[in-house]
Amino acid sequence: MTSLLLNAKCLVVKVGSSLVTNNGAGLDKGAIAAWADQIARLVKSGRQVVLVSSGAVAEGMQRLGWKKRPVAINELQAAAAVGQMGLVQMYESCFASHGLHTAQILLTHADLADRKRYLNARTTLRTLLDLGVIPIINENDTVVTDEIRFGDNDTLGSLVANLIEADALVILTDQPGLYSADPRKHPDAQFIQYETAGNPALEKMAGGAGTLIGSGGMLTKILAAKRAARSGAHTVIASGREPDILVRLAQGEVVGTHLKAGQVKTLARKQWLADQLRVAGKVVVDEGAAKALREGGRSLLPIGVMAVEGSFERGEVVSCVNTAGEEIARGLVNYSALETARILRQPSHEIEHILGYIDGPELIHRDNLILV
């Protein structure tokens, strides 16, 4: 067996808070220098690397003299704003010693939800990689709200992997990888070395939140791997405490949990649709429509819609759920919530008569719809 990273040319590496801080008390320069050294070796071997690094909040807490991680979002935003300066400066200094340039990229969900901004971000990142620059990515904490935040850097890392169509996502944590149960509570827990990303059994086994310093538990990592697999990216979850972990993985050594992207790669536009973490509303579909969506790859017609939930406008992303509330698909809707409520259960030829205009016979065209 060899590492899934052996032939990977473009990597997204996510480094957790505990791996770049002194137990949450500010940044650990020695640790960051070591990460820069490993990534520099990968770049000089011909690979492209995007770094998603935690640590801004912890550094901000240190600079502000806060001992306890704040709960209020405005205080977290303030800590992140202060700490981001130190985080980027330290990475810049460490990479400069290897003759490499870095670039700071701060993203929000709104950047990736808007198709034009999404494509612009992809072009910029690809250009930076072609120039041999190391993009250092984080969430733009100072402007996000609780409703539109990524929530953790595992999620952000997977979205970036999809954005640039990376070959692999590496999630480095303070744990060796994924177990069948929490090994701290269950000594007989089995270590999972190889599995397919998206296997439902993994989500059932994954635990809750991690340390007090970070924000992501194993479940977020499993979901991140599932998301990254849509663009064909394999995921490795491994301990950042292992010496030269990135270099060893790139050389083919099997360390940590390897989650293979077993599914067929999703088309770029549909992948973007699937990556939308927030939906504007829901439409409840009947059994016939649910079957047509699942099995036939059909468009969603108004006649198959039973109810509308939420307030959405034309062109926004909505979730399609069955009568049991289970999400089947999501897509870009052709009509607003108010208009949808007027035409639901109606045949498509009645749309123009009811609304006074028609923007297509489908509520959601199959080209703008993806199964989930």
Curated annotation (Swiss-Prot):
Residue positions binding substrate: S54, D141, N153
Binding residue positions for ATP: K14, T173, D174, S215, G216, G217, M218, L219, T220, K221
Primary site of residence: cytoplasm
Keyword match Phosphoprotein: no
InterPro entries (UniProt xref): AceGlu_kinase-like_sf, Asp/Glu/Uridylate_kinase, G5K_ProB, Glu/AcGlu_kinase, Glu_5kinase, Glu_5kinase/COase_Synthase, Glutamate_5-kinase_CS, PUA
EC code(s) of this entry: 2.7.2.11
Domain PUA: 280-358
Pfam family, one: AA_kinase
A GO biological-process term: L-proline biosynthetic process
Catalytic activity: L-glutamate + ATP = L-glutamyl 5-phosphate + ADP
Keywords: Amino-acid biosynthesis, ATP-binding, Cytoplasm, Kinase, Nucleotide-binding, Proline biosynthesis, Transferase
This protein's pathway: Amino-acid biosynthesis; L-proline biosynthesis; L-glutamate 5-semialdehyde from L-glutamate: step 1/2
HAMAP family referenced in this protein's UniProt entry, alphabetically: ProB (MF_00456)
Entry's family note: Belongs to the glutamate 5-kinase family.
Function: Catalyzes the transfer of a phosphate group to glutamate to form L-glutamate 5-phosphate.
Protein name (database record): Glutamate 5-kinase
Natural source organism: Methylobacillus flagellatus (strain ATCC 51484 / DSM 6875 / VKM B-1610 / KT)
